[in-house]
Amino acid sequence: MSDLEDEIKVLRRKVQDGEEALQRAGQYGLQLLDEKMELHNRLEEQRTEMSNVIEALEQDKYTLQREVELKIRMLESLRSEFDLVRTQQKHQMEQQQTLLERNHAVEISDLKNKVVKMKTDLEEAQLAEKQMRHKLDQQAEALNSKTEELRALTERAHETMSSEILELQVQKMELESAMATLEQELQEAQYKDEQLHLANTTLQRQLERLTEEKEEREKEAVSCYNALEKAREANQDLQIQLEQVLQQAQDPNSKGNSLFSEVEDKRAAMERQLNSMKRNYDSLQKQHVLTKQHMHHMKMQIATLMQLQGNRADPAQLERLQFMLSDKNKEIESLMMKVRELEKEKMAVKDHHPHPPSNEGELKDETYYTDLLKMQLANSKKDAEKLKEELSMARMKALSESQRVLELERKLYGTEQALKLRHSDNMKLQVKLEELKIKYTPNEVNKAQVQKRRREKFPVPEENSASVKDETTTQDTELSKNSNEKAEEKTPSHPVEKPVVIPLQSEHPTEPNPVLSRESKSVRICEDPPVCIPDAPRSPVNDSNSKNVDQTHQSSEEEENWRTEKKRKKYQQPTHVSSQKTMANECAQQ
């Protein structure tokens, strides 16, 4: 019992810590919202100031650019003359360099050919020398073997040997000589093979050298073709410059026409306006990127808060477990009291046990009554044993049912916790997916955002959802029609997954939350009378057993009611929130 109480205390502490963490997270979220609004206002002020400063600087820049252009035109004439002289000198240097490179390439190719020929001659001489040495070694070995054979024959001639052995020796010598001739032929064939292999290698080297020369000639041809193309392009550029000079000579602006000066002034004013609009567009685009990053950070915080809420223990489950624990404790205490009472009664019966009577005549007279009482007592004992067996069977069935119900509750609670964790993981993955889309395909994301206006669904109660609907319908009537028509046209090609956002807990932890009470597990105690065992002679143990049976029936009925209510409350009506952000909506989300 003490261990269970300690576990309950630890679980309560964990629940309190989780609630405190959620409260702190909510407070931090509100603080972050306030800081966000302050930063947004500051950024707006700084943006306006910077846009004004940038416009002034752009105007100064434009005037300075005009002055610089005049000076650049003065310098361009000098640079053009300098470039002409430099290009002529470069062209001459390139021609000389190409001639020298060609001469050097021809000389290098000749030297390479000579080196290759000398290498091939050297390899052939080395191979011939090697073959001759090998032949010399073989002939020396054959000479030594022949001398040894002659010496052996001379020694054997002196000895007495039969004619058959001599014939066999002669045949052996003939076979050895034939084998030696075959080996010589084989070696000559190997020498020829090596010579052919050497010739093949030399031919391959010549082929590689020829292919290299061919590639060099092709590169030279390509370089010549490129030089020809560059010359053509230079000729075209010169023709274009000549045409431009002729047009400038015929330009009426040079003659002082006032109409073209007015057009030039209007063009300059429009160019200034275009520059200012570009600067404003750049600043607004940067602000949009900052707000998008802030939205991603907020989504990550919401995902972490959802994960914390998933890790939090269910208060209804804890209350249910505590209630069952208290019932079991009461049952154990009642059983202990009954056991003590039975022990006291047993001791009292032993103390007050009647002594055997002394008179035998009185026993003989009262035998009839004692036999009758004994028969009644035996019948009552048999009935009591039968009832005990029935009660024990009923108790075992009730315990098995309660154990099965507890196991199902544990599994259901585990699946709910896993579902919450999966929701938080899904939220994080969606945020990461959006970040990757923005990182790798920002243009497509911007087009999708312009084409479609999404509505995020927040699972809030029906009363709050009705109030939110009344506030948002007035703001989003025209936009929703257009966006719905566009979405119906483009939904089959580009399906968009809508993220589910769960509202955070409020700052006040003591007040009961109606949303949590709806979503959490509820236990309803049925008021119907429990099923009772028919009347019979009861003992204190039987009374306790009947109570246990009643409690098991009641727990099973509570479990069925709880399941039906859970099935009813699975569906939760979503509320549509407009895409325009307001302070009230953001506070409600937090």
Curated annotation (Swiss-Prot):
Top-level taxon: Eukaryota
GO MF term list: kinetochore binding
Keyword Cell cycle: yes
GO cellular component labels: nucleus; outer kinetochore; spindle pole
Biased composition (Basic and acidic residues): 483-497, 518-527
Classification via InterPro entries: SPDLY_chordates (IPR028593), Spindly/BICDR_Dynein_Adapter (IPR051149)
Coiled coil ranges: 1-401
GO terms under biological process: cell division; establishment of mitotic spindle orientation; mitotic metaphase chromosome alignment; mitotic spindle assembly checkpoint signaling; protein localization to kinetochore
Polar residues: compositionally biased ranges: 541-554, 572-590
Protein name: Protein Spindly
Organism field: Danio rerio (Zebrafish)
